[in-house]
């Protein structure tokens, strides 16, 4: 017996190891997170990560630049936090993974803001200066928001497309693709916004429902004899009539120059009260009903027989200015799904119309193009000059009616193109623009841009995989890229073009380099103020400065050139490992970057593309002001903490829509608390543990501790495989299960007795603490990519001598001998424990026992279950959290059972176990023999648990 004298005071004489930790139960995230943001910045944590990562293999996530305009919204938060999780997880996986954030700075939205604030009459130099200042102000505002979300990066030196070096390198990239033969100038219908006064990129177009007039119009016979012969008739039985078209754009009728028929569709000559009408045979019945006519088909012929016939313009009778005829051209794009099977062609206002007319010999100068950039007809247009096309629509209908050419006029609801900025309808409009040719043979005679880009898509990894087919289809079907824009605040297409021929100056490549050098020093303003004579001397009499600017998608689409290999080449490299954006960027940044890199380098600028969905409310509805269902990330961060936003994003399958609501945030917060409570338990029970002095080698651990570490190591391997594939939601799901079930529901539950009641420095307790130390090392690191604030807070308590968790790599768990067999055995034991817990709960419900420690259980088991249980010996009771446990072998699984009885022994005051030896020591009548030994002797001996 020990000679220790026990204190006679009952509360002080039987202490248990209930320890505290400075890691609080309440996260108080809205208050603490901003302090961490300041701390990370003040101590240069991002720079420390970079220093720690030197010499490792590079991993480059290239930031797709948000536009420098407006506050950050929830979509920004999703995007930036996903990127942050990727970068942090790659750094911890042993890579050098820098994060250089960037901003898209030129373009229409900022120019519109300047116009709103200062009017439209500012000199160009002032527009530039104010646009730069505005973009800078917006960047600083957004930067604060991104940092508040816990995103670490090169915030002191981000890339900006408006930085002089980036602007200059973009001009050099333009020179390269001209040199390679991809760029040409031509008249083509492009997406045109009247409010922007400029061409739009495909990615700047959105579709909205709209109601427009729909009309069926008669083009009268101009060659009745030829028409009769085409239908196999000697002559037409009557002179009245013609060919019928259907359109939803009456405003294009004044510019009609042709009619398109499908060569293989059968067309009918129909005798009606309105004369002879030509239309597709399979549309006759529907059209007669729509027109309110009765008709009889008197002849049929395939479309090819009608080629080159001419018909009078439908407004010829309304004004002499329309006394012209329209030829019939053949086109495979004509269908009979709707309308009459005849398409009226205004080549200035439709891509297929334009292509067809050009293919049939029409020159650019032949094309009638009366709509100006502001949406008004030129003043000289007969009947409608000076009107906007939308105001002209009803007047054109009236004029057609007066001319006897209108067969039907109704309203038609359909999905129509709109400008993504102004939300106003746009049109196709033929303008002289600079294009990158998708099917143009490059100067080296190699593959076309389309072929190269499609090959690059095939060579790219997609997350999720369906993105490959989507981008492939977009590239396969897209038209030539309209590179030019008619704005001020943009990188100039710094060409000198011949005043008469429009040809580029023969020294264009050399001149572009000269301009780039000036832009490098002074920004794009250098081009605005440049006197042409400075560069081309007397040639300035023949050549003028091109006024077009580059599409802003070329700005961001060449960041692989002017950022990865330009402004930040010391940190980054080409190609990037990953581009990560919303799924709309298949037709945006992913797309433009692919095309520019295909032209410049013959490959994609990325090895992988990751796309995430958009945020929706709890009912799956898109967030909008009208529905009032928007959620502001600032408000959530200030109320619940940015950590809750991070955990919500990490726990959601980003490949689809990301649903968020107050109810969802409540569930996320509850999940966060469970993780935090687990960390608090771990840290508290390690607060008197010094790994260097107190740790035991794995061979001396109790069996359950070896199992716990083996299990944690196995889990980590699974988690790292998910991280490798950017699968974050399974990481969160498995870690939440680990914290709540594997740790809280089992291992830590079993461990409490040993941690609290064993002698502080006993091998049994140090075994448990050594295992907890390893589990905590591993757990904090796998949490860090998404629970960054919490992992850092816990790490500073756990490893106070370390600067930050973010310079660590994933933990190397100690090797556990026979780990696989150990995990299998304890999986079986946990299964049995589940049966016992159920039986204990039934006994508690029946008021046969109070707590589980009041119970003594007998487990009847067979086979491997018996072997596993029996191997624990007397430690089985600790695993089952009962005061006594015995195991009885039975022959068959069907004979297995759990018997629960209330203990008849007294309860130990200290450990709360019911034991026969409580009071065995007269000086300590309320203490069991186990606790007496742990307090005053050498302590109990355990082997398993």
UniProtKB/Swiss-Prot annotation:
This is Isoleucine--tRNA ligase 1. Its main location: cytoplasm. It comes from the Bacteria. Keywords: Aminoacyl-tRNA synthetase, ATP-binding, Cytoplasm, Ligase, Metal-binding, Nucleotide-binding, Protein biosynthesis, Zinc. Catalyzes the attachment of isoleucine to tRNA(Ile). As IleRS can inadvertently accommodate and process structurally similar amino acids such as valine, to avoid such errors it has two additional distinct tRNA(Ile)-dependent editing activities. One activity is designated as 'pretransfer' editing and involves the hydrolysis of activated Val-AMP. The other activity is designated 'posttransfer' editing and involves deacylation of mischarged Val-tRNA(Ile). It catalyses: tRNA(Ile) + L-isoleucine + ATP = L-isoleucyl-tRNA(Ile) + AMP + diphosphate. The lineage of its organism: Bacteria, Pseudomonadati, Pseudomonadota, Betaproteobacteria, Burkholderiales. The keyword Ligase applies. IleRS has two distinct active sites: one for aminoacylation and one for editing. The misactivated valine is translocated from the active site to the editing site, which sterically excludes the correctly activated isoleucine. The single editing site contains two valyl binding pockets, one specific for each substrate (Val-AMP or Val-tRNA(Ile)). Belongs to the class-I aminoacyl-tRNA synthetase family. IleS type 1 subfamily. CDD domains: Anticodon_Ia_Ile_BEm, IleRS_core. It is an enzyme of class 6 (ligase). GO terms for cellular component: cytosol. A motif ('HIGH' region) lies at residues 66-76. GO terms for biological process: isoleucyl-tRNA aminoacylation. L-isoleucyl-5'-AMP binds at residue 581. ATP binds at residue 625. Coiled coil: none annotated. Monomer.
């Amino acid at each position: 017996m020990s000679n220790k004298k026990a204190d006679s005071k009952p509360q002080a004489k039987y202490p248990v190891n209930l320890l505290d930790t400075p890691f609080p139960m309440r996260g108080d995230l809205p208050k603490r997170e901003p302090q961490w943001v300041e701390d990370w910045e003040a101590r240069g944590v991002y720079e420390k990560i970079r220093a720690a990562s030197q010499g490792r293999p590079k991993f480059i996530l290239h930031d797709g630049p948000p536009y420098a305009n407006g506050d950050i919204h929830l979509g920004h938060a999703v995007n930036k936090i996903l990127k942050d999780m990727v970068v942090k997880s790659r750094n911890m996986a042993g890579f050098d993974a820098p994060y250089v954030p960037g901003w898209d700075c030129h373009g229409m939205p900022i120019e519109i803001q300047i116009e709103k604030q200062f009017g439209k009459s500012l000199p160009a130099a002032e527009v530039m200066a104010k646009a730069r200042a505005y973009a800078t102000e917006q960047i600083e505002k957004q930067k604060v928001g991104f940092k508040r979300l816990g995103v670490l990066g090169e915030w002191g030196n981000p890339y900006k497309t408006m930085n002089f070096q980036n602007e200059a390198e973009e001009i050099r990239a333009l020179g390269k693709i001209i040199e390679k033969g991809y760029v040409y100038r031509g008249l083509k219908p492009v997406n045109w916004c009247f409010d922007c006064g400029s061409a739009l990129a495909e990615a700047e177009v959105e579709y909205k429902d709209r109601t427009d007039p729909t009309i069926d119009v008669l083009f009268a016979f101009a060659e009745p004899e030829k028409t009769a012969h085409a239908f196999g008739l000697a002559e037409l039985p009557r002179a009245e009539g013609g060919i019928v078209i259907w359109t939803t754009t009456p405003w294009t009728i004044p510019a009609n120059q042709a009619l398109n028929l499908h060569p293989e569709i059968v067309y009918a000559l129909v005798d009606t009260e309105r004369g002879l009408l030509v239309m597709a045979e399979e549309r006759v019945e529907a059209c007669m009903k729509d027109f309110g006519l009765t008709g009889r088909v008197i002849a049929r012929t395939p479309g090819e027989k009608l080629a080159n016939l001419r018909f009078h313009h439908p407004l010829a009778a309304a004004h002499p200015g329309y006394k012209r005829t329209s030829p019939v051209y053949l086109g495979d794009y004509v269908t009979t799904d709707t309308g009459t099977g005849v398409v009226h062609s205004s080549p200035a206002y439709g891509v297929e119309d334009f292509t067809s007319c050009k293919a049939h010999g029409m020159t650019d100068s032949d094309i009638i193009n009366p709509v100006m950039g502001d949406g008004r007809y030129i003043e000289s247009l007969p009947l409608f000059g000076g009107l906007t096309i939308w105001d002209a629509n009803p007047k054109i209908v009236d004029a057609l009616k007066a001319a006897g050419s209108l067969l039907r006029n109704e309203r038609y609801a359909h999905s129509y193109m709109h400008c993504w900025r102004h939300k106003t309808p746009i049109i196709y409009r033929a303008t002289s623009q600079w294009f990158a040719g998708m099917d143009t043979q490059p100067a080296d005679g190699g593959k076309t841009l389309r072929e190269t880009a499609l090959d690059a898509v095939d060579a790219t990894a997609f997350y999720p995989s369906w993105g490959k087919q989507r981008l492939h289809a977009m590239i396969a079907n897209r038209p030539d890229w309209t590179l030019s824009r008619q704005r001020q605040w943009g990188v100039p297409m710094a060409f000198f073009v011949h005043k008469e021929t429009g040809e580029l100056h023969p020294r264009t490549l050399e001149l572009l380099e000269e301009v780039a050098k000036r832009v490098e020093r002074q920004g794009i303003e250098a081009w605005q103020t440049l006197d042409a004579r400075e560069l081309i001397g007397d040639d300035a009499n023949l050549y003028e400065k091109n006024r077009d600017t580059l599409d802003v998608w070329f700005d961001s689409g060449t960041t692989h050139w002017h950022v990865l290999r330009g402004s930040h080449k010391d940190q980054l490299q080409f190609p990037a490992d990953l581009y990560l954006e919303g799924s709309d960027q298949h037709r945006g940044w992913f797309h433009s970057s692919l095309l520019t890199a295909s032209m410049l380098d013959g490959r994609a600028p990325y090895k992988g593309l990751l796309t995430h969905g958009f945020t929706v409310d709890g009912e799956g509805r898109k967030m909008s002001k009208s529905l009032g269902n928007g959620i502001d990330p600032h408000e959530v961060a200030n109320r619940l903490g940015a950590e809750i936003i991070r955990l919500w994003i990490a726990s959601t399958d980003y490949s689809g829509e990301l649903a968020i609501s107050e109810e969802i945030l409540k569930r996320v917060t509850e999940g966060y608390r469970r993780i935090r409570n687990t960390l608090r338990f771990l840290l508290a029970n390690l607060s008197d543990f010094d790994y260097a002095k107190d740790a035991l080698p794995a061979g001396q651990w109790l069996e359950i501790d070896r199992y716990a570490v083996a299990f944690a190591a196995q889990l980590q391997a699974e988690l790292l495989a998910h991280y490798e594939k950017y699968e974050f939601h399974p990481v969160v799901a498995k870690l939440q299960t680990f914290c709540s079930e594997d740790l809280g529901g089992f291992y830590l539950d079993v461990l409490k007795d040993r941690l609290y009641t064993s002698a502080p420095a006993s091998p049994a307790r140090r075994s448990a603490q050594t295992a907890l130390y390893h589990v905590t090392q591993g757990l904090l690191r796998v949490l860090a990519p998404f629970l960054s604030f919490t992992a850092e807070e816990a790490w500073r308590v756990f490893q106070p001598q370390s600067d930050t968790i973010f310079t660590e790599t994933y933990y190397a768990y100690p090797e556990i001998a026979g780990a696989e067999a150990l995990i299998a055995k304890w999986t079986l034991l946990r299964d049995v424990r589940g049966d016992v817990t159920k039986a204990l709960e039934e006994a508690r419900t029946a008021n046969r026992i109070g707590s589980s420690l009041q119970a003594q259980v007998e487990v009847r088991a067979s086979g491997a279950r018996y072997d596993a249980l029996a191997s624990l010996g007397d430690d089985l009771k600790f695993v089952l959290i009962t005061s006594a446990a015995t195991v009885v072998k039975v022959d068959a699984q069907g004979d297995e059972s759990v018997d629960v009885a209330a203990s008849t022994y007294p309860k130990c005051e200290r450990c709360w176990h019911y034991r026969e030896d409580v009071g065995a020591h007269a000086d300590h009548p309320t203490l069991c023999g186990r606790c007496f030994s742990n307090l005053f002797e050498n302590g109990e001996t355990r082997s398993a648990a």
